[in-house]
């Protein structure tokens, strides 16, 4: 492979600051993406001139295997924003794959609440784009988080009540 002879080729920048990784991720070349990342994981740090990185572009195109490979290398990549403040989740809801939306939410649940520079979360974008199936995926995810937080809150309340009851018994006994 060319990279064995000249590793610097992986950082060659084309139009709009597009690297081989960004181009491969956009076009759906999973094997190329994996090979590039195995040679140089720092390629994940490079964004195009508009701030979009390989994850943004693969998410928009619905390339599930590439999104998974990128997130496996760096789950924090899901939080990175472009110049409009959009995450890969914002891009995915405009795209074609509900599975990519799920992968991003599983990688970092907090991104569901992140607004872009115009105040739009991914749910707002899905609604505006009339992406009903994506809206449902996000809504179900939010409901599962809500159930989790209700359970956690219940556990905390029970624990606090138990501690308070124990404290009251000690005070009463003294």
Residue ranges and their predicted role:
Residues 1-29, 34, 39-45, 52:
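Leucine-rich repeat
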Residues 31-32, 65-66, 99-100, 133-134:
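Conserved ankyrin/ankyrin-like repeat signature
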Residues 144-164:
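Hydrophobic alpha-helical signal peptides and transmembrane signal-/tail-anchor segments
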Residues 1-8, 35-42, 69-76, 103-110, ...:
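Ankyrin repeat domain, specifically the short helix-to-loop turn at the C-terminus of the second helix
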Residues 10-11, 44-45, 79, 113, ...:
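Ankyrin-repeat junction/capping positions
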